[in-house]
Design a protein with these regions (language model features):
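Cytoplasmic helix-loop-helix junction between adjacent transmembrane helices
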Residues: 98-132
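Extracytoplasmic gate region of multi-pass secondary transporters
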Residues: 23-24, 205-248, 252-255
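Symmetry-related core transmembrane helices of the 12-TM Major Facilitator Superfamily/SLC fold
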Residues: 156-174, 363-379
Length: 392
């Protein structure tokens, strides 16, 4: 029964990934059609991410009241309706309003399912969970790139994503009795959760450092996701559909990285996988910084996705091991808020810099985030080693 539930959770994470890569891929076509400056894309991203941060911080209370299954099903349905609304939007303002339910839904799904899997499943299953998120963010730009070249355009891409998301939401509602059965069985084995405030969490050694790691890793992810296509169009002189096709390399690399992390987790520790991911990203940053042709940019984007994607699930899985199962829900909620702060702040600043200095700043910006990530990993390993934790 727990295995069947895990499969359903995997489908829920496909639904979590679907909206995340759509907007960045579609934005060049949207701002061209609506006659908008490309930096306005940050406004939609900000609203969406503020919703996600808010729901992440309050998710432990919501989930405690209604249960992970119900919250996940309702949140997925909410994001499906928002995707339909995007496809019907004729101006910029509706996109901003529709970004609110997209963000709120994503925060509850992300926090609830991450803590659930971190407590009850293996590190391999955690990485595979995020691999399915990778499938979601790979499917949507692929579909969008195909539909951008047709008469349906970006609206058609959002409609297709809506139907996929709606199907996942219906699956979650139909299988709610299964969630209730498994929840009743696991409740006897779970450690009673403590709800801690941000102030209390900040006093725990290592928690603030983990916030930095999530902020930097997710900053790299969101900047590449949201501005990768614009970088290719504005700086590499590609068309919108060409850029969308190149961005598929990033999302394929992202998904492959999560898959390989799940396979390697049966033999290697989380920390070893994290160090391998950072090494792969280092190669990607060098390639991206060099003035090389478009084919090399595709390779660099692929390696950024493959190297960065294992970090989030492994950082998350380590949470109850580093800080204790009793406070893991609160810590993970704060980490999801930190990650979404990265999703919010990093692309916003990149968009503003790109508007003033050109999108050629993107490789330098990503490299700066990468350096902060390396320093953060070194520091948290030192803290955990001092606390007697195994960092091998």
């Amino acid at each position: 029964m727990a295995t069947l539930l895990l499969i359903i959770i995997y489908f829920a994470f496909i639904g979590l990934g679907l909206p995340d890569s759509l907007f960045g891929t579609a934005w060049p076509a949207i701002y061209t059609e609506m006659g908008l400056p490309f930096s306005l894309g940050s406004a939609v991203t900000i609203i969406m991410t503020c919703g996600t941060i808010t729901s992440s911080l309050f998710s432990s209370r919501v989930i405690a009241k209604y249960g992970t299954g119900k919250v996940t099903a309702v949140s997925t349905a909410m994001t499906a309706l928002a995707l339909l609304g995007f496809s019907l939007s004729g101006s910029f303002l509706p996109l901003c309003f529709l970004a609110i339910p997209l963000g709120l839904g994503a925060g509850d799904i992300d926090t609830g399912l991450n803590n659930y899997v971190a407590l009850l499943y293996t590190s391999s299953q955690m990485s595979l969970l995020h691999c399915f998120y990778g499938i979601g963010i790979t499917i949507s730009p692929y579909l969008m790139s195909r539909l951008l070249a047709t008469h349906t355009g970006w609206r058609g891409g959002y409609r297709v994503a809506f139907f996929i998301q709606l199907g996942i939401a219906l699956l979650l509602f139909v299988t709610l009795p299964l969630w209730n059965k498994v929840a009743g069985k696991e409740a006897e084995e779970e450690t009673p959760a403590k709800v801690l405030s941000l102030k209390e969490l900040a006093k725990i050694p290592g928690v603030k450092n983990m916030w930095l790691l999530f902020l930097c890793s997710c900053g790299i992810e969101s900047v590449t996701n949201n501005w990768g296509s614009t970088f290719l169009v504005e700086f590499k002189s590609m068309t919108a559909d060409q850029a969308a096709k190149i961005m598929i390399f990033y999302f394929v690399g992202f998904t492959l990285g999560r898959l390989l992390s799940g396979i390697l987790a049966t033999r290697l520790s989380c920390w070893k996988i994290i160090r391998m991911g950072i090494a792969v990203m280092g190669i990607a940053m060098v390639l991206l910084l060099l003035p090389l042709p478009g084919a090399t940019v595709a390779i660099a984007l692929f390696l950024i996705g493959m190297g960065n994607s294992p970090l989030f699930p492994n950082f998350t899985y380590l949470t109850p091991r580093n800080f204790g199962a009793d406070i893991s829900q609160s810590v993970i909620g704060s980490q999801m808020a930190a990650s979404n702060t990265g999703f919010l702040v990093a692309p916003l600043l990149c968009g503003l810099l790109g508007q003033f200095f050109g999108m050629g700043v993107l490789p330098i910006y990503l490299a700066a985030l990468f350096v902060c990530l390396i320093l953060g990993v070194a520091n948290i390993q030192k803290t955990m080693k001092g606390a007697g934790k195994d960092i091998r």
